[in-house]
A protein has these predicted regions:
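Second-shell loop/turn segments in exported
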Residues: 25-28, 41-55, 86-91, 133-144, ...
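A non-catalytic alpha/beta surface segment that caps or lines the substrate-entry region
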Residues: 39-42, 46-105
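Solvent-exposed loop/turn segments at secondary-structure junctions
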Residues: 46-47, 71, 78-82, 107-108, ...
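Extracytoplasmic/secreted proteins, especially bacterial periplasmic and envelope-associated proteins
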Residues: 32-35, 39, 52-72, 146-153, ...
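Acidic/histidine-rich catalytic neighborhood of metal-dependent amide-processing enzymes
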Residues: 96, 135-224
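Bacterial N-terminal signal peptides that target proteins for export
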Residues: 1-9
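Bacterial N-terminal signal peptides
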Residues: 9-19
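Active-site-adjacent substrate-binding region
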Residues: 76, 209-309
Length: 309
């Protein structure tokens, strides 16, 4: 977990620095995040959307926020996804997911959303099951217990600090089936709430990748990119953490931008996004999918949803 802790340091420093004044440093950065990530991964494996483990983990996260003094609740949402059988028959699977929201009120009406998905991969086909992808035993430490751990540590560090803007800590579900929880969250937001959302910070896959990346949404204005992505890179360097942004080797993903997780829902809605992830945008198709160089431990250079890795 050493790399995860290092990544946590950068993510926490990012949130603290561009939102808040100087903070107390009673504990080493990443210590709380590491403990929480390990607990969530080992106690709640198989956090598939709508499963008992997902509901229990959502309640655990809600209780953690409540213990910190936050107003916190769980919002259920109904959705569905397609499952493909071995004979190529496709059927809809209905699910009820759980989204956890905790509120830190600010002096102004504007808000920043800090988000990490709590669900693990559910097999979308018989082929997925045959290949040990997802299911009841997948702990999901990289995807995405570590992201939850970072979010919980940031919430702990910020709980007694007045802020200019409100902060919403959100643990979504249904990300693995197509960003279902994020879509529901956006759908429930009023036009005024969307207007007042200055930034969405999405934490996902913080361990396995070769490098820590800070990337902006494609619709995020240049001025906001400088205040968020570029400042995050500078903060990471100041903490001795090497961080990068997408070099733009794939024309579908321009330099300095990210994609392909819950943050994308808000990016497409025109809300500024900062993606925080660990991967390697210089490998494979240069789309961020290949997380690291291929090796005996990671034959494909990825750990995506594989119970065996």
């Amino acid at each position: 977990m050493f790399s995860a802790t290092r990544h946590c340091v950068a993510a926490l420093a990012l949130g603290v620095c561009f939102i808040l004044p100087a903070q107390a440093k009673n504990q080493p950065y990443g210590e709380i995040a590491t403990q929480q990530a390990r607990h969530i991964a080992t106690v709640f494996p198989g956090r598939m959307t709508g499963s008992p483990a997902e509901m229990l983990s959502a309640d655990y996260i809600r209780q953690q926020f409540a213990d910190m003094g936050y107003q916190s609740d769980i919002r259920s949402f109904h959705s569905r996804y397609i499952y493909t059988s071995r004979n190529k028959t496709q059927n809809w699977h209905n699910v009820t997911g759980s989204t956890v929201i905790a509120a830190h009120e600010g002096r102004a009406a504007e808000q920043i959303i800090i988000m990490a998905h709590l669900d693990t991969y559910a097999p979308l086909s018989d082929a997925d099951t045959d290949n040990n992808l997802g299911g009841l035993t997948l702990q999901g430490i990289d995807d995405n217990a570590a992201g939850l751990g970072v979010m919980l540590e940031l919430a702990e560090r910020m709980k007694n600090i007045p802020t200019q803007y409100g902060i919403r800590f959100v643990a979504t579900s249904g990300e693995e089936e197509g960003k279902l929880g994020a879509e529901n969250l956006l759908k429930r937001m009023s036009a005024e709430e969307k207007k007042n959302t200055l930034l969405v910070i999405n934490l996902d896959n913080l361990i396995v990748g070769d490098k820590l990346y800070f990337n902006s949404g494609q619709s995020t204005p240049g001025s906001v990119r400088k205040l968020t992505r570029d400042r995050a890179l500078a903060i990471a360097r100041s903490h001795g953490v090497y961080a990068a942004s997408n070099p733009g080797g794939n024309p579908n993903y321009p330099r300095g931008t990210g994609c392909c997780n819950d943050g994308e829902v808000f990016d497409k809605a025109g809300i500024p996004v900062l993606y925080v992830e660990a991967t390697n945008w210089a490998l494979g198709k240069k789309d961020g999918y290949q997380q690291r160089g291929k090796s005996k431990a990671f034959p494909d250079g990825t750990s995506w949803h594989n119970v065996m890795l």
